[in-house]
Regions:
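Charge-patterned, long linear interaction tracts outside catalytic cores
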Residues: 143-152
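Second-shell residues forming the walls of enzyme active-site clefts
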Residues: 1-136
Length: 152
């Protein structure tokens, strides 16, 4: 088991360099760094909010790794995994290898995306000024911006 200092000096330094050069998206793995946190990186507020957003000043989108992977079972049942990933700081959660679960999970999920997440995802879709698109959608009364993003 590596210490947090070792992880920061070796692994995080690469990400910090990429962030400084304009990295616009990351995908945390389901790897557990037990010296730093009890949760795997993709379910960890420590890694996504503290280390990535605050310490490394990452402004891009965070996409979860596939929630149907065996490594994700540490997050619990499927709905619990998705909620944990969103609460940890993921902007979008991927469910790639179990498409039959998507509708079921969406019906169970009660989640409102933050305006920051929406802006990051709009940026990934090519919007140069996502805050304007978000403001316009709110003014036009779009209730579910998540659905709007997914269909753009």
């Amino acid at each position: 088991t590596r210490t947090l200092d070792e992880i920061e000096s070796k692994d995080m330094s690469i990400f910090i360099s990429l962030i400084k050069h304009g990295l616009n998206a990351v995908m945390p793995s389901h790897v557990l760094y037990s010296a730093a946190d009890k949760d795997p990186a993709g379910f960890s507020q420590f890694w996504l909010k503290n280390q990535l957003r605050e310490k490394a000043h990452f402004k891009g989108a965070i996409f979860s790794d596939d929630m149907s992977m065996k490594g994700a079972v540490l997050g619990g049942e499927m709905k619990d995994r998705i909620v944990k990933a969103l609460e940890a700081g993921c902007d979008m959660v991927l469910l790639c290898n179990s498409p039959q679960l998507v509708d079921e999970v969406l019906l169970q999920l009660d989640w409102k995306m933050s305006s920051e997440s929406i802006e990051r995802l709009l940026t990934m879709k090519g919007f140069k000024e996502p805050h304007i698109a978000l403001k316009t959608s709110q003014e036009k009364g779009f209730k579910d911006m998540t659905a709007q993003i997914m269909t753009m």
